[in-house]
Amino acid sequence: EESLHHVASSDGRLFLLVSELAGRGTQAFHYAISARIRATPLSFHWNAGKAPHLTVSGQPGSTVTLKLKSLRKNFDETIELTPFGERGDYEVFGPSSIGKEKGNFDFEVQVPETMKPGEWDLLRLRAAFFKEGDNQKEWTDVLDFKAAFQNVFPNIPFPPEELLNRIPIFVMPRKIEVSLDPITGGPGDTVEMKVSLEKKDGAFRFIKPKTSWHGFPKEWKVPVKAQDFDEKKGFAILKFTIPPKTVPGNEIEVFASVRGELENERYMRVFSNRISIGITGKEDALEETE
């Protein structure tokens, strides 16, 4: 008696429930089913990279890079993208349009000078596409955010509703950085790696920060699990032993990250820095002798 609206499953099947009041042998109803294919020519994956916090961030006036990948392989039209948020349109540097047969592009978005450190905005995309001799058409919410989210959190099926098709942009304090002390040691030596968080802006405080180390070869047996960062002391120390078979003279680049929620903010932030570990040993001694 009423028109029914359903979203069909991926295999195209639609199930109809026969009323319990229908008696055997009664006249059957004839269902007219019409299907409309919802085209998604302007849906893009946001490439979040390895960022576990799933945000882009920058200082007021700086630029951030968005990497977008189209869900379509071929384009017969030209597409123009405009990022916007609660503050209106964002200024874009460089080309913001995709020509024919191009589905991937990067473009730089400026963090407004008027935004203050600690503020958030949720970026969306407004897209316009047009063919020769055709009228221009526009869509909004053209991001497909689920892929980026699932790459980082595979055990969580969907992002929070507030983040669907939106990229959180966070305005960074001007001075928060991870500091690492230089490290050298020979094969078999036990060394320490000190990680500290330098904050020049006292208004920001990490809540339950964790420290992680990345880039170490497996044979170095550096713990993969994040460790507590001592807020009172302002640093964390990693102790590890350089494997005896490590070749002297080699240099290994690793990096440390400090992860935590900034006070009064909902989303996780990660700050990181790189450091090189120099392997000393007999080869160095021979060079000095020569």
Model-based region annotation:
Residues P83-P95, S212-V224:
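Short, solvent-exposed loop/linker segments at beta-strand-coil boundaries, enriched for Pro/Gly
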